[in-house]
């Protein structure tokens, strides 16, 4: 627990007594969200960006999703676009200090800054239905929210496996609609998950309208 004169754990640079002492910050997730708001001071639409980011994060934790970067990125992309935020849906190879080889992954970018929730519960090196590997805390505006500094993850790195990576090639040859429709755990695919999260955000979205609007979108390859 921070003392009154300690630096505030939200990362604002202010003393705790001058910042979040009267706010309920009891978990790492709360601290991450406070840091995201601090990072967003010069960002357009900061509140819907932060709220949507963490609504998707909380939903993925509640549903116990692992290795779900494409699903998480697709949902976040649609929610941000529906709130007037010019997000881009990216896929490519990334490199983590915790993994000795580059691997295919997807994420969202806004104004060329990375917003990535998928590495928090990544698939482990040896597949297991009950385990995951934490490669990074959520990355918001290029910032690792746990370290509160620029992420060490490298995005869009080259790879000799570009043509042979089955996961990458599959996603590149699908529309967003194909992927969202094929999600097996909701009767309306991932579109239903979008509507669930939108309701929590106070957004009124129509299932059929968003399907029609985004069904032909695709993941953009970043290299």
Language-model segments: residues:
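Short Cys/His-rich zinc-binding micro-motifs
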Residues: 1-17
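A structural boundary/capping signal
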Residues: 16, 22-223
